[in-house]
């Protein structure tokens, strides 16, 4: 997959002359191409003879046959297009000289009309070209290697001298008719003069084949000099100790995301940092490609700065930017900077918590491990720091001896320095034979704080099959004890192609692509790497290559092959010891003094504190008011004031202080909400949970300090402890006259508007803590909710019920028909469900003889979120032995009425009135009771009962425009009619009795009416508040109903209950006749307070920002 976006690198503004390099390159390139064709083909030479002679005479050097000149012009064209300044200088020099010659000829006169036209036209073209090149000077910013001009001149002189000497020797051996005194001048003219001197100046001629050889020597010298001149600057500087130390610090702070991050410490790479020092890119330059490895290191927020600095560097030296092994996050950052991304393959990640050798998918690994263990192999795992120097030397010798290449390969996914003293956190996994001899090893580098990434894999030719599988498996199985949660194995190139091509129904292109990869795997380990990782059932994480333009993909690919060591060029410096001389660390970071010259990691806490002290926290983008408060906090700390001290209990709450006598000494604590400063006297409003009080700070009454000190140190929202005497202000306002005060909590973020508070409902949900701090109504709601919960417990306890707790994590979801949340327990490698209801466990207690039991706790249903639904909610379930569903009518009404009394002071429910107000509605007394069929009949205007057939019910539903599903039975259609026509239209609290049996699988059939279950629902103002059953205690009937539910679940119904065999077995021990109640406590709170579920819950579920 490739995604593209035009790159717009900051810092280089688009100029009106931005087209000049490309135009100059095209112009010279056309001449180079035609010159090459003319040198090859006499036909082309004949076709272009007239324009070529004109261009050669008046505009630009254009000989009819010269391979050397064609090649030189091609290099010049490429250098111009790459914006190299030396190419601009050469072209400008050539044009200026040509213009001077044309001007001289024009001034000399005596030419024909055709010659005058050519010279005037050529001079005009040269003048225009000079002006354009001068105006476009700033567009040629790319540098070449230092001293390239002198090196090129030296190569030309040396090459020319060698060519002249060799040619002189040849002409002495085969002089032909050439006079002895003309031989050296003749060959010099041919080799370095390109035969510009007239042949008639020399006496005689050598053999014809010698002239071609003399020209070839000169061409080779010129070509070599041109290559040296236009070569891109190499990145000669590698990591210094300070650079490596900074990178290690960034890895400790931000290295958890990229498994390849530690490989950025390879010392044969160069590095460039973001200006802030919080991100860096390591790279190497090969064949004009600046190849970055993996993601930028450091804070992802600073990646754009690092990428921009890297792209600027590429532009400066004319390098083509390329990236190998970027993660999805890194590729996105490079793409946003304008590069393109191409998926290369996938990295195999093992999660030890999910790893197991059991199961059919792991059969191959399990058998390999068994073979290795039968051969007597054991595994030893150690950190490098725990290995002695002598052992490490032996380890290095073994690794070198078992290597199947002459030197270590790797660039983006290998470290290449086993046993380095700086890598003490690396992990060594060894396989030992029965004689304790090492027969294989893995070395893994750190990946953040809890992961490792494979660096080196070696095995002895004599090691038994399954050795590698044994080491990987043991590492995964022992990972928890080693503090490892992630293991990065090998990289599989083109993994998706193997999988897609092998799928049933794969298209011809996918199959052909897979066949090609399998074919080339005979020479390169493409398929082998994929298969060797796939057998561990890893998570596959994609890795990307990034590039600037599609035309440079081959170049980037070759550069990658060179960097990884698969292709070694002549004069390669791959095995050179790399030590940088010029630190790339920004001065700001170096000035901290935290970096180490030996490359070891700096004090990370010091780096973090230094960044915060500079007011530039890498974790956050801070608003201005927050920065002001942070600066104030810094000043308080520098003055020795602890802004977050140990707590001391106040003597009074605000409410108690307000009731205290005048002159009473009190101490209160709370949040400052308002401040009014009148110079020597300052008034503030302090609020705790019980209320709000005015505090008065008078310079004459303070034991120490002044009111101005309070004003300077305290911001709105700060927590303050006030001690003083109760009294009144001059206006008679009850106040606390402060003697001393103490800051107990500095608020670093400003509170909302003091008059309006939080007006956005979503903001109130997301920042409930702020809402509670400033909104008295929110505090009243949370208090009312607490009163309801307490009242429910007290009412049930007074009736002899005991409260229990049953499991929230359940192996089978049951007790209600709802979609559950699913989680996973690693210890037993099994899925669990967050309970949708505690019913089945409470009934187990009933079987055990607990006659009156209830649970008030959380339940979870993976359903919608609206005015009355939240995925996590509070549910009451209670069971009373030797009772039925009618017993719970009075008990449920009593529960709700008592809760309303506790929350509102009277048995009233708050209902919306006009203007957004709430008004109380009396809910005392006895509530209405109706059967479901009677209520539906009233709504339809036609009598129905449990015997009404399905066709009639469907006809009535169609007439009422109530939709239903074809697979529903009569009971389900009745329930749908009830929900639309009865429940949603109910006002006053009403009990609806006797539901169809088919929609009540856990309910006892009615004792006298077939097809009816003994169940009621309590509904008030369109919301179901609770339900009660005469519980089904017949284990045989219970099994039949749950088996029906399990069949629905197997058929794909996500809300159907599963078969709980343990529950059914418990029921077979006999459960007494029982009446059960289920009540949504959140909805009862809604009824009593008149608010939505999101308002009454302290922390309802909210979408992330």
From Swiss-Prot:
Region Phosphatidylglycerol lysyltransferase, annotated ranges: 1-603
Region (Lysine--tRNA ligase) residue ranges read 604-1105
Q: How is this protein named in the record?
A: Lysylphosphatidylglycerol biosynthesis bifunctional protein LysX
List keywords of the entry alphabetically: Aminoacyl-tRNA synthetase, Antibiotic resistance, ATP-binding, Cell membrane, Ligase, Lipid metabolism, Magnesium, Membrane, Metal-binding, Multifunctional enzyme, Nucleotide-binding, Transferase, Transmembrane, Transmembrane helix, Virulence
Membrane-spanning parts: 20-40, 62-82, 86-106, 117-137, 154-174, 186-203, 208-228
Tell me which GO cellular component terms the UniProt record holds.
Answer: cytosol; plasma membrane
PANTHER family this protein is in?
LYSINE--TRNA LIGASE, CHLOROPLASTIC_MITOCHONDRIAL, LYSYL-TRNA SYNTHETASE
Q: Look up and give the membrane topology term.
A: Multi-pass membrane protein
- Where found? Cell membrane
Name the protein family.
In the N-terminal section; belongs to the LPG synthetase family. In the C-terminal section; belongs to the class-II aminoacyl-tRNA synthetase family.
Q: InterPro entries given for it?
A: Aa-tRNA-synt_II (IPR004364), aa-tRNA-synth_II (IPR006195), aa-tRNA-synth_II/BPL/LPL (IPR045864), LPG_synthase_C (IPR024320), Lys-tRNA-ligase_II (IPR002313), Lys-tRNA-ligase_II_N (IPR044136), Lys-tRNA-synth_II_C (IPR018149), NA-bd_OB-fold (IPR012340)
- How is its cofactor bound, per UniProt? Binds 3 Mg(2+) ions per subunit.
So what EC number does this one have? 6.1.1.6, 2.3.2.3
Say what the protein does.
Catalyzes the production of L-lysyl-tRNA(Lys)transfer and the transfer of a lysyl group from L-lysyl-tRNA(Lys) to membrane-bound phosphatidylglycerol (PG), which produces lysylphosphatidylglycerol (LPG), one of the components of the bacterial membrane with a positive net charge. LPG synthesis contributes to the resistance to cationic antimicrobial peptides (CAMPs) and likely protects M.tuberculosis against the CAMPs produced by competiting microorganisms (bacteriocins).
């Amino acid at each position: 997959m490739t995604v593209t976006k035009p790159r717009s690198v900051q810092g280089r503004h688009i100029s009106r002359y931005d087209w000049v390099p490309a135009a100059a390159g095209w112009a010279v390139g056309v001449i180079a191409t035609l010159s090459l064709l003319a040198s090859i083909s006499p036909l082309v030479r004949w076709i272009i003879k007239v324009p070529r002679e004109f261009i050669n005479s008046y505009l630009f050097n254009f000989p009819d046959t010269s391979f050397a000149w064609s090649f030189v012009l091609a290099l010049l064209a490429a250098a111009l297009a790459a914006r190299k300044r030396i190419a601009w200088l050469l072209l400008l020099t050539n044009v200026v000289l040509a213009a001077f010659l044309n001007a001289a000829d024009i001034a000399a006169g005596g030419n024909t009309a055709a010659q005058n036209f050519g010279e005037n036209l050529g001079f005009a073209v040269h003048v225009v070209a000079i002006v354009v090149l001068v105006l476009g000077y700033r567009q040629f910013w790319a540098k070449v290697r230092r001293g390239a001009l002198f090196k090129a001149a030296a190569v030309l002189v040396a090459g020319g001298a060698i060519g002249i000497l060799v040619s002189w020797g040849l002409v002495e051996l085969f002089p032909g008719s050439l006079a002895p005194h003309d031989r050296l001048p003749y060959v010099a003219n041919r080799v370095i003069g390109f035969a510009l001197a007239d042949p008639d100046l020399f006496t005689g001629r050598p053999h014809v084949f010698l002239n071609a050889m003399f020209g070839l020597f000169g061409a080779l010298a010129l070509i070599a000099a041109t290559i040296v001149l236009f070569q891109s600057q190499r990145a000669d500087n590698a990591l210094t100790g300070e650079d490596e130390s900074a990178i290690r610090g960034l890895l400790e702070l931000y290295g958890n995301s990229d498994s390849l991050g530690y490989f950025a410490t390879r010392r044969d790479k160069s590095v460039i940092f973001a200006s802030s020092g919080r991100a860096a890119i390591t790279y190497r330059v090969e064949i004009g490609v600046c190849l970055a490895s993996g993601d930028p290191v450091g804070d992802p927020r600073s990646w754009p700065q690092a990428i921009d600095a890297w792209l600027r560097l590429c532009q400066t030296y004319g390098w083509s930017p390329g990236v190998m092994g970027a993660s999805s996050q890194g590729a996105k950052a490079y793409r946003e900077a304008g590069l393109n991304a191409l998926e290369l393959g996938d990295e195999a990640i093992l999660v030890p918590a999910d790893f197991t050798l059991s199961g059919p998918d792991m059969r191959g690994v399990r058998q390999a491990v068994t073979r290795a263990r039968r051969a007597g192999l054991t595994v030893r795992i150690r950190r490098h720091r725990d290995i002695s120097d002598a052992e490490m030397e032996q380890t290095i010798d073994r690794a070198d001896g078992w290597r199947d290449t002459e030197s270590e390969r790797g660039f983006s996914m290998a470290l290449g320095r086993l046993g380095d003293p700086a890598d003490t956190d690396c992990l060594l996994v060894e396989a030992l034979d029965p004689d304790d001899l090492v027969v294989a090893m893995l070395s893994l580098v750190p990946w953040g704080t809890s992961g490792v990434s494979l660096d080196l894999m070696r095995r002895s030719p004599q090691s038994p099959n399954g050795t590698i599988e044994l080491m990987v498996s043991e590492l995964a199985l022992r990972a928890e004890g080693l503090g490892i949660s992630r293991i990065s194995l090998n990289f599989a190139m083109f993994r998706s192609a193997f999988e897609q091509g092998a799928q049933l129904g794969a298209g011809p292109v996918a199959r052909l692509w897979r066949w090609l990869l399998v074919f080339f795997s005979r020479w390169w380990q493409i398929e082998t790497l994929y298969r060797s990782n796939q057998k561990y059932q890893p998570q596959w994480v994609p890795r990307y290559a990034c590039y600037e333009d599609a035309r440079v993909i081959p170049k980037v690919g070759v550069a990658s092959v060179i960097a990884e060591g698969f292709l070694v060029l002549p004069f390669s410096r791959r095995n050179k010891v790399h030590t940088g001389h010029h630190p790339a660390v920004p001065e700001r970071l170096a000035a901290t003094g935290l970096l180490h010259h030996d490359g070891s990691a700096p004090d990370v806490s010091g780096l973090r504190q230094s960044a915060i002290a500079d007011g530039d926290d890498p974790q956050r983008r801070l608003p201005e008011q927050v920065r002001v408060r942070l600066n104030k906090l810094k000043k308080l700390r520098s003055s020795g004031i602890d802004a977050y001290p140990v707590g001391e209990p106040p003597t009074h709450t605000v409410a108690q202080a307000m009731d205290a006598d005048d002159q009473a000494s009190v101490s209160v604590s709370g949040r400052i909400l308002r401040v009014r400063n009148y110079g020597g006297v300052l008034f503030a409003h302090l609020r705790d949970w019980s209320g709000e009080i005015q505090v008065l700070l008078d310079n004459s009454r303070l034991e120490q300090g002044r009111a101005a000190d309070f004003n300077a140190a305290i911001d709105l929202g700060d927590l303050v402890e006030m001690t003083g005497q109760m009294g009144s202000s001059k206006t008679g306002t009850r106040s606390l006259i402060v003697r001393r005060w103490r800051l107990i909590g500095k608020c670093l973020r400003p509170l909302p508007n003091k008059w309006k508070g939080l007006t956005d409902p979503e903001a109130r949900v997301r920042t409930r803590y702020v809402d509670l701090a400033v909104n008295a109504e929110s505090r009243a709601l949370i208090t009312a909710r607490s009163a309801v919960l307490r009242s429910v417990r007290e009412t049930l306890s007074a009736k002899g019920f005991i409260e229990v707790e049953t499991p929230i994590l359940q192996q089978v979801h049951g007790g209600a028909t709802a979609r559950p949340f699913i989680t996973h327990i690693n210890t037993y490698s099994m899925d669990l469900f967050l309970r949708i209801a505690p019913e089945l466990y409470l009934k187990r207690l009933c079987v055990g003889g607990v006659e009156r039991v209830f649970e008030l706790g959380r339940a979870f249903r993976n359903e919608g979120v609206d005015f009355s639904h939240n995925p996590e909610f509070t549910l009451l379930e209670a069971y009373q032995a030797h009772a039925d569903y009618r017993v719970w009518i009075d008990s449920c009404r009593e529960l709700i009425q008592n809760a309303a009394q506790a929350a509102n002071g009277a048995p009233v429910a708050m209902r919306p009135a006009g203007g957004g107000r709430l008004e109380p509605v009396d809910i005392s007394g006895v509530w209405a009771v109706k059967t479901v069929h009677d209520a539906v009949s009233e709504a339809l205007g036609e009598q129905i009962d449990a015997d009404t057939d399905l066709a009639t019910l469907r006809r009535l539903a169609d007439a009422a425009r109530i939709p239903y599903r074809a697979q529903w039975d009569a009971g389900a259609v009745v329930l749908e009619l009830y929900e639309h026509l009865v429940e949603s239209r109910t006002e006053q609290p009403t009990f609806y009795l006797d539901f169809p049996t088919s929609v009540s699988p856990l309910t006892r059939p009615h004792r006298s009416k077939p097809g009816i279950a003994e169940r009621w629902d309590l509904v008030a103002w369109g919301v179901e508040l609770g339900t009660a059953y005469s519980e089904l205690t017949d284990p045989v009937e219970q099994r039949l109903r749950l088996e029906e539910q399990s069949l629905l679940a197997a058929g794909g119904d996500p809300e159907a209950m599963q078969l709980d065999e343990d529950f059914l077995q418990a029921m077979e021990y006999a459960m007494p006749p029982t009446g059960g109640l289920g009540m949504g406590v959140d909805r009862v709170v809604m009824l009593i307070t008149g608010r939505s579920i999101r308002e009454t819950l302290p922390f309802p579920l909210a979408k992330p920002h």
